[in-house]
């Protein structure tokens, strides 16, 4: 990941159900309304170091997971969309089972098409570790912790100190986001460009970072428990969102659509695949439109 720091986003275990639930759906762990168009995500991690990875480590033999190699770097093909439109819970042409023996692991990105092929009663205990980078100049499309700070009190002292440090890393990132948002609110172009380049140093993919920031600005308005919400007044939150309205409109179509293989299960106006013909300078210019 070429990062100064790496922190766990999630620590979990996959276990077999008590009853046979059969296969799940082929999917990428993203939605168009939450992470933005797929093109932005794969453009970013092709051009820059990866900022997010998932590990599955099997404690017992596990062949539940299937992957479609290379699909994290491209759109679905027409043939794949046709097959997925018929059924999202059958083997997909080109998909391969990941046959883990006890002690084996597989590392992958959650934007790849993958499938839990059979939730049966066969014993399954597979650890999942999800990591994100800090300090490699990329904002990952998943950048929030699923673990709660209260867990630190239950950890050994040395491990608790590490998790306290992880919270500090996230706090510093929120501080930087706040500086970016305040520059947008105040139409301070110089500070905006400077701080955005700090958050996402790669020129390629910086627009993807801006799309992710637009999603954060949306959450500030509507999610009362967002950890950054209290940093801004209600007027500031509304003004910030107004700066993003034009970009948000470009990320939508006139009528709802649904592309198979995403976590979206209902049609949405938010575009699944292509990024708009719009760059960071266009975004700055839109503040006065």
Regions found by a protein language model. Give the residues of each.
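Non-heme Fe(II)/2-oxoglutarate
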Residues: 112-289
């Amino acid at each position: 990941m070429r990062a100064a720091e790496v922190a766990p986003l999630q620590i979990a275990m996959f276990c077999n159900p008590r009853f046979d639930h059969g296969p799940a759906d082929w999917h990428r762990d993203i939605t168009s309304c939450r992470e933005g168009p797929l093109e932005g995500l794969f453009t970013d991690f092709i051009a820059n170091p990866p900022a997010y990875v998932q590990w599955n480590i099997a404690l017992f033999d596990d062949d539940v997971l299937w992957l479609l190699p290379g699909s994290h770097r491209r759109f679905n093909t027409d043939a794949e969309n046709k097959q997925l439109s018929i059924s999202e819970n059958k083997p997909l042409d080109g998909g391969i089972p990941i046959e883990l023996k006890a002690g084996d692991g597989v590392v992958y990105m959650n934007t790849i098409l993958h499938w839990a092929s059979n939730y049966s009663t066969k014993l399954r205990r597979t650890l999942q570790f999800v990591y994100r980078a800090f300090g490699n100049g990329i904002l990952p499309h998943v950048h929030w912790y699923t673990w709660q700070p209260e867990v630190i009190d239950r950890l050994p002292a040395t491990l608790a100190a590490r998790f306290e440090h992880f919270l500090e890393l996230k706090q510093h990132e929120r501080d930087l986001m706040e500086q970016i948002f305040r520059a947008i609110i105040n139409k301070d172009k110089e500070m905006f460009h400077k701080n955005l380049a700090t958050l996402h140093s790669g020129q390629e993919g910086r627009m993807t970072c801006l799309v992710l920031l637009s999603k954060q600005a949306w959450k500030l308005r509507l999610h009362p428990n967002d950890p950054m919400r209290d940093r801004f007044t209600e007027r500031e939150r509304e003004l910030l969102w107004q700066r993003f309205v034009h970009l948000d409109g470009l990320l939508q179509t006139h009528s709802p659509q649904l592309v198979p293989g995403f976590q979206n299960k209902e049609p949405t106006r938010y575009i699944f695949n292509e990024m708009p013909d719009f760059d960071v300078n266009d975004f700055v210019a839109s503040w006065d439109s």
